[in-house]
Amino acid sequence: MVREGEERIGNRVSLGVIGVSYRETTLQQREQVLHILQQAQGSFRPEVFQEERDYVLLATCHRVELYSVAPAELFDSLAQEIELLGVSPYFYRNQDCFAHLFCVAGGLDSLVLGETEIQGQVKRAYLQAAREQKLSFALHFLFQKALKEGKVFRAKGGAPYAEITIPILVDQELRRRQIDKKASLLFIGYSEINRSVAYHLQRQGFSCITFCSRQQLPTLSMRQVVREELCFQDPYRVVFLGSSELQYALPHSLWESIWDIPDRIVFDFAVPRALPSHTVFPHRYVDMDQISDWLREHRKEVNSAHLHSLREVAYRYWNSLNQRLERRDCVGANA
């Protein structure tokens, strides 16, 4: 649903994004920034800025961003709070906000250059915000067009092929640790990253893969166990954690036994991490910080022509948005 009576985007109010990514921050810092942005929801209440403000929170393994149509002082206050962590967030407004999200959705701003997962992550963040709030026309327009053009950009071959991906890196790490392909692998959470890793490992010959989720998944071809039946005493050689909510969804007594199997390896794909850092065995635990370091070693440079072409598309949509808002103002004034 689109908000009525939306305020014009201008000098006082910006369509903007504030956030951090793998470039500026460690995983721990991104977790802290995510907490700040989640707590900032109170800043969007009417008693703070005289009217309700809408926003979209995008949180992935490698970035945490908040998009909103809001006064400059709101973005400034968030930036100041984030800077207290020793982090310098980026802030893009209006046409630069458009250009940024278009490049994100197109995979050109990803650590895994050209990855496709980010398209789904952006879409889910947008749809969740649309379910929970009455989003402004500007935010609807921004996300719908970024998702559309990201898809078109890939279809035309603009996005580079991602030669090194997280599933490939996980496969390489299992080989390095000499994990047998008959070893029992457990994936907790039916997240996109868990699915992509599981199906890749299955294609590589790993034959004993189990998924654990809230309920049975009728279309899943792999073994399944529901959360109520999960037991870390079972001989899972490798455990993959695909959701940050697992830390609170599973009982503490269960987590205490996750390291009981000698030499068990745990991959924690969640942001925030599913396992607190003080509870892990470092030589048996891999989180997104380590994976990010591996990806940086293999990252390709962005093709400047691809970047320029996608930004130009974004700028055209920004101009189109302003024209639409002006027409709405004229209709409202003449009503």
Swiss-Prot record:
Gene3D superfamilies associated with the record: Glutamyl-tRNA reductase, N-terminal domain
Active site: C61
UniProt entry keywords in alphabetical sequence: NADP, Oxidoreductase, Porphyrin biosynthesis
Site description Important for activity, residues in chain: H100
List of residues binding NADP(+): G189, Y190, S191, E192, I193, N194
Top EC category: oxidoreductase
Enzyme Commission designation: 1.2.1.70
Keyword Cell division: no
UniProt pathway annotation: Porphyrin-containing compound metabolism; protoporphyrin-IX biosynthesis; 5-aminolevulinate from L-glutamyl-tRNA(Glu): step 1/2
Residues binding substrate: T60, C61, H62, R63, S110, E115, T116, E117, Q121
Catalytic reaction annotation: (S)-4-amino-5-oxopentanoate + tRNA(Glu) + NADP(+) = L-glutamyl-tRNA(Glu) + NADPH + H(+)
BP terms from Gene Ontology: protoporphyrinogen IX biosynthetic process
Molecular function as annotated in GO: glutamyl-tRNA reductase activity; NADP binding
InterPro entries: 4pyrrol_synth_GluRdtase, 4pyrrol_synth_GluRdtase_N, GluRdtase_CS, GluRdtase_N_sf
A Pfam family it matches: GlutR_N
Stored HAMAP family: Glu_tRNA_reductase
Subunit field text: Homodimer.
Function as written in the Swiss-Prot or TrEMBL entry: Catalyzes the NADPH-dependent reduction of glutamyl-tRNA(Glu) to glutamate 1-semialdehyde (GSA).
Alphabetical list of PANTHER family matching this protein: GLUTAMYL-TRNA REDUCTASE 1, CHLOROPLASTIC
Remarks, miscellaneous: During catalysis, the active site Cys acts as a nucleophile attacking the alpha-carbonyl group of tRNA-bound glutamate with the formation of a thioester intermediate between enzyme and glutamate, and the concomitant release of tRNA(Glu). The thioester intermediate is finally reduced by direct hydride transfer from NADPH, to form the product GSA.
Comment block on domains: Possesses an unusual extended V-shaped dimeric structure with each monomer consisting of three distinct domains arranged along a curved 'spinal' alpha-helix. The N-terminal catalytic domain specifically recognizes the glutamate moiety of the substrate. The second domain is the NADPH-binding domain, and the third C-terminal domain is responsible for dimerization.
Family: Belongs to the glutamyl-tRNA reductase family.
Protein name: Glutamyl-tRNA reductase
Organism: Chlamydia trachomatis serovar D (strain ATCC VR-885 / DSM 19411 / UW-3/Cx)
Gene name tied to this protein: hemA
